[in-house]
Amino acid sequence: CVTDGYQVYHTAERVLEHLTVAGCWVHARRYFDQALKVIPKKIRSQSLGYLVLKQIQAIYREEGKLRDLTSEERLRQHQVVIKPLVDALFLYVKQHQTAIGGQGKLAQAVTYLLNQEKYLRVFLENGEVPMDNNTSERAIRGFCIGRKNWQLIDTIRGAENSAIIYSIAETAKANDLKPYEYFEYLLTEIPKHM
């Protein structure tokens, strides 16, 4: 599963042998983006944060070209094209790490990136693993926004049922189906098989 750097996921990976945790490049990128905002505009383009963002952008650009490939072809291209970019990024950050110091947004960004290196490299080893979890986060965004509206759900069972319905709706969307029509189909067809 592709996740942010929340330690619980890494603990779960150690406990569950079949689980592989992959790091999310968007989360890593976000740390550098936030660090860049506190750097004066005049010197921003010469900063380590800016240069790291440009390197991450180059990785994403190359990854975008692989979208229509099979997972096997994507894996080959990861090794040939993208792995050297990722290697160069981590080498660059490690070489400049001491110049940053131990505090501030940029130091946090560098620490996060280096602590997550193992997980951020997972997508290079498997053509089916995406670089980030944006697709998943987009899918749950509506659920998170609607959280206030669902405060009226006052039982565990009600919450579980809401989650099931929401999951079915998101699955329909992910498969290019119209959720309303899909529910209509399910509610018509399921009783026929009971």
Feature map (PLM): residue ranges:
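Catalytic center-proximal scaffold of phosphoryl-transfer enzymes
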Residues: 1-194
